[in-house]
Structures are given as C-alpha cells and as structure tokens.
C-alpha cells in the first residue's frame, strides 16, 4: 500500500490551548500559588490568561526547542484544543511547502502557505524544508498571544547560506523579547 504522507526527517506535535483562570491566591509570605482556579466568566468572555503550546508557557522555547538541520524536512502536526480561539499558525522565517488543512491528507495540500487558520477542535499538518540555519519562531499570528505564551522555537543548525540570507549585524537578543531565543 502507498503511504499517504511521504517520509520526512523530523515529525513534531504541537498543540495550542488556552486557559481561563482567576488571579492566583498568595500564601502568608506573599508568594503566588502554583494552583490556579478556573474562571467561568473569563471563559465566557473568551479572554484567556494563557494561550500556550504543548500545555505550558515556554514548553517549546529555550529549554526544549524543536530541532533540525539545514537540508532537512520538518513536518508539524499542529492541533488547536481551544476551547474558544482560532489559531493563525505561522513560523517566522519559513513558509509551509505543504499544508494539509484540517488534517486532510487525501486532498492535495496547499503549497507555499505562510499562515494556516486552525479553528478550535481542529488540526493541520504542515511541512517545511529548512534551508538556512537559525532560530525559527512558531507563533499564533494573532501576535499578542505571544505575550500569553503562544511561542516556540525551531533551532536549525548547519552551514550559513549568505547567498540566501545574510545580515550585516550579528544576531543579538532583544531585551525582554519573547520572539527570539
């Protein structure tokens, strides 16, 4: 039998979800509790306190980024657990050579797509060929969700490709920025 999806070098699973909670309680020493209480009013008004990838803020950033090498193909199975917000999944610095919207692997994929809309309870499958080394940033392109935790990194190693991309200034971190490693 013929495989529906062709083999790739790396496959990753990324799930976006949002959390609605009350402000954390504090203990006698003024430290906030790590246990949060669900907020029905915040959920009803669709105002999440957190929008995250893989269950928590920072799950796919500096400590646990996705990884690949130049010349490799990466497939991301991206889901949106919701419960309320539609995700505009985007990888800064790349485009999706193939995008299987709604996880539909029987229809031809979209080609060279920049951003994929994923409603709550749905999924998509995207593929990227990594050409230039660097840190690629996974975001919900409703960009202010970045400050609520919807950010991850794909670190690509390999030989520089100044014929494709170069910068006069060396990379340097932005103070307080969540967009870069």
Spans of model-derived segments:
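Copper-binding active sites and cupredoxin-like electron-transfer domains
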Residues: 1-181
């Amino acid at each position: 039998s013929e495989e529906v999806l062709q083999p790739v070098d790396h496959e990753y699973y990324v799930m976006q979800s949002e959390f609605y909670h009350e402000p954390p309680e504090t203990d006698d020493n003024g430290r906030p509790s790590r246990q949060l209480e669900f907020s029905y009013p915040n959920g009803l008004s669709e105002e999440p306190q957190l929008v995250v990838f893989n269950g928590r803020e920072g799950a796919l950033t500096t400590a646990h980024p996705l990884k690949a090498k130049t010349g490799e193909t990466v497939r991301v199975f991206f889901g949106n657990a919701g419960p309320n917000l539609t995700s505009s999944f985007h990888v800064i610095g790349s485009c999706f050579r193939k995008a299987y919207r709604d996880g539909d692997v029987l229809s031809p994929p979209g080609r060279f797509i920049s951003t994929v809309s994923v409603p709550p309870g749905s999924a998509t499958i995207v593929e990227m060929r990594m050409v230039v080394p660097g840190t690629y940033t996974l975001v919900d392109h409703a960009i202010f969700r970045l400050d609520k935790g919807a950010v991850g990194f794909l670190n690509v190693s390999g030989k520089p490709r100044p014929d494709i991309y170069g910068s006069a200034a060396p990379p340097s971190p932005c103070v307080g920025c969540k967009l870069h490693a």
